[in-house]
């Protein structure tokens, strides 16, 4: 089973690993140095794959941080790559999409897109979904053959999300544009199913969970939309703007225990970073605030800086990072702090989750590995 093979771990962009015990105590295991701010990592079978704002794709040993191979490029590669059984796919700001051997870095194919990539690509089954300036393209992962493309008025914003439903004729893809809209396409032929305007430009791509699409924008609006029709289930608004994609701790994957209530299992929780220094926390039923104060509910959990990196959830722990370089572990139901780690510069790209490891990219040109031992965790 893959650890975290693409942006936020899967084609839905869930950003969660609820089947694992979360880190209630962490230690810094290693750091790896690069040239340029580090992009969004992915990891699979003890190897981390990551690019930088200066270019190149690197394969790093997940245990030691040592370099296994590097593919040189002349353009930025800071979007999350995709790793599969045999290949690694990654794109550049120059509009190139590459497929290389996951073991050696040897190149299989190169695809030139009509414009620079604007987000991480997504893989669903044997196809890649790639957003760029002016549209979205779908190609065969093994060969790079383009199946169809969809023109947009502006640039695709954030990583496209793909999901399937047994009542549909095939999968569907969800994406946003900088023209302040989110849309749904048939994954088979690119036919538009629905389009919904947003109040601002999406902050990161859509997230799909339990039949809903969640999008947050830089105008401070969170929308929960029906995956089939685009109908709005709820709207949550805040002053300022959101600055990360939505992470959903889905209730359908939880069990009632000493820290997870029956209400949590029924409704689930959203976590969204904002430029007001809060991770906003709502339920998935009505979009109500879930963090309680002495007299009134609070908008979320306060951090030291803006939150551009999307939250990731491991078990019952939400892992967060902000623009001051602070990294936190927060209880996902009580919202108390479990741990805190201070890095040397801002964290603006989303971390990756491995086996008992969190890989955090930093703007100080380093990748940090934070590690935990499930047998040496503090009690609940």
Labelled PLM ranges:
Residues 1, 5-78, 82-118, 122-380:
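Extracytoplasmic/lumenal domain signature
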């Amino acid at each position: 089973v893959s650890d975290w093979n693409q942006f936020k771990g899967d084609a839905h962009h869930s950003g969660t690993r609820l089947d694992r015990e979360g880190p209630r105590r962490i230690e810094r295991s290693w750091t790896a140095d690069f040239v340029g701010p580090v992009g969004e990592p992915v990891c699979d079978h003890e190897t981390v794959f990551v690019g930088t704002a200066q270019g190149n794709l690197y394969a790093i040993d997940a245990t030691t941080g040592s370099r296994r191979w590097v593919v040189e490029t002349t353009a930025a590669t800071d979007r999350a790559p995709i790793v599969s059984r045999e290949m690694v796919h990654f794109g550049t700001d120059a509009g190139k999409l590459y497929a290389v051997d996951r073991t050696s870095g040897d190149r299989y194919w190169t695809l030139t897109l009509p414009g620079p990539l604007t987000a991480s690509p997504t893989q669903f089954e044997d196809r890649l979904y790639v957003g760029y300036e002016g549209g979205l393209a779908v190609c065969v992962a093994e060969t790079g053959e383009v199946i169809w493309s969809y023109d947009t008025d502006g640039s695709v914003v954030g990583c496209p999300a793909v999901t399937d439903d047994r009542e549909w004729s095939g999968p569907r893809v969800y994406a946003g544009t900088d023209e302040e809209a989110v849309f749904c396409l048939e994954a088979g032929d690119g036919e538009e199913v629905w389009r919904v305007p947003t109040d601002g430009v999406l902050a990161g791509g859509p997230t799909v969970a339990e039949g809903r699409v969640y999008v947050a924008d830089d105008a401070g609006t969170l929308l929960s939309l029906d995956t089939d029709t685009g109908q709005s289930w709820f709207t949550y608004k805040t002053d300022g703007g959101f600055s990360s994609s939505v992470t959903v701790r889905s209730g359908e994957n939880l069990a009632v225990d000493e820290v997870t209530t029956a209400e949590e299992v029924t409704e689930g929780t959203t976590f969204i970073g904002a430029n007001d220094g809060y991770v906003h926390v709502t339920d998935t039923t009505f979009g109500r605030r879930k963090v309680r104060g002495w007299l009134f509910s609070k908008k979320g959990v306060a951090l030291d800086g803006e939150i551009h990196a999307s939250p990731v959830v491991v078990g019952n722990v939400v892992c967060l990072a902000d623009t001051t370089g602070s990294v936190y572990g927060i209880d996902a139901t009580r919202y108390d702090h479990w741990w805190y780690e201070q890095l040397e510069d801002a964290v603006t790209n989303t971390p990756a989750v491995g086996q008992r490891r969190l890989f955090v990219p930093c703007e100080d040109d380093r990748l940090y590995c934070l590690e935990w031992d499930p047998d040496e965790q503090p009690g609940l």
